[in-house]
Each structure stands twice: as C-alpha cells, then as structure tokens.
Regions:
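Soluble ligand-binding/transfer domains with enclosed cavities or grooves
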Residues: 2-179
Length: 179
C-alpha cells in the first residue's frame, strides 16, 4: 500500500493545480505510516525542492504555471533559500535563512536577508538584498521525506507538499547569494 500512496501523491503533485480534497487524505496517511527523522535523512533533505501544493491562501504559496517556487536546502551548511523564479527577464525573489536541525522532524528557521535577484547580464547579475529582522520564531516540521517527496507543516499550520528537482543545481541557484 505504501508505494502506491507515494505514487498517487506524486502523480497528483505533477498536475497543474493539485486539489486539497485529493492531497490532504494522502498527506495524512503518509504522515502516519512514514514518519520522518530529519537527522537520519540529511541526504534526502539536501537539494532543490519545488513547492507543488500548499494549504495556504497566500499568492506566493500557490502553484502558478508562470512561477517556479523553489526551496534550496543545504542542512550541512545550515542554510536555505526560498526562491521565487519569475518569468524572464524579471529575475526572482530570494530569502536566505539559517537552519537549525531539531530532531526528530523540526527545523528551526531564522530569516537573514531577502530581496530581488536580477537576470544575468554576461558575468553580472544585479541584486538588491536587505537584512531581515525576524520578530518571531519560525520552524518547519518535515513529516514525510524521501529522495522525491517532502511533506511539511509550517509554524503557522500551513501544509506543504514539495517534489525534489534533481535537474536543478544548488550551486547554480545560490552562487550570487553569498551563503
């Protein structure tokens, strides 16, 4: 039954607009059947993840065909980047964070800086980043984790379903951010 549930949710997440009514039951069942221990799954956690579904109503947490909503996780470096890649030639919006692994499933998040990352012009890539003064503690519970799928719950109760993007390189996406 387990592999079928993973296949079902991955197939749903590859649809243009996955529906909550389809995702939530599988989300809950996988959380129950396959609990995560982040400390033992650092290799699975590391990499580029694409947000494919969220329970949030925030526009930047919705799946849009014109927007790549990526999260680059580098737990060995205690760093992460949330990256909204806008259509060319607009560049993207990035937020850099420091991570603190808190086993078994919690990751503490401290946002450091964020802003606009422009498109590349030859060797030059303009950016406008500013420091962030985080007023509240933030965290993410990684509840299910494989090398293909990550299910998480945010500190505000939001559910997130992400698929791993093996075709994207963490170094290329983060090189201009001076992590």
């Amino acid at each position: 039954m387990g592999q079928e549930q993973f296949s079902d949710i991955l197939n749903l997440l590859r649809l243009p607009k996955p529906r909550a009514v389809d995702i939530i039951p599988l989300f809950a069942q996988l959380e129950h059947d396959y609990p995560c221990n982040v400390e033992n799954q650092i290799d699975d956690l590391t990499g580029v993840w694409e947000l494919r579904w969220s329970s949030s109503n925030a526009p930047y947490l919705q799946v849009q065909p014109w927007l790549d909503n990526l999260q680059i996780l580098l737990p060995a470096d205690k760093r992460a980047v949330n990256l909204l890649k806008l259509p060319a030639p607009l560049g993207g919006i990035a937020v850099v964070a420091e991570l603190q692994i808190q086993p078994p499933k919690r990751i503490g998040v401290t946002f450091i800086r964020g802003g606009w990352i422009g498109p590349k012009f030859g060797l030059f890539k303009p950016k406008l980043l500013t420091n962030i003064k985080q007023e509240f503690p933030a965290w993410l519970d990684v509840t299910v984790l494989t090398n293909e799928l990550r299910l998480s719950r945010g500190s505000d109760g939001t559910l997130f379903a992400l698929i791993k993007r093996h075709d994207l390189n963490t170094s290329e996406l983060t090189s201009s951010l001076y992590l």
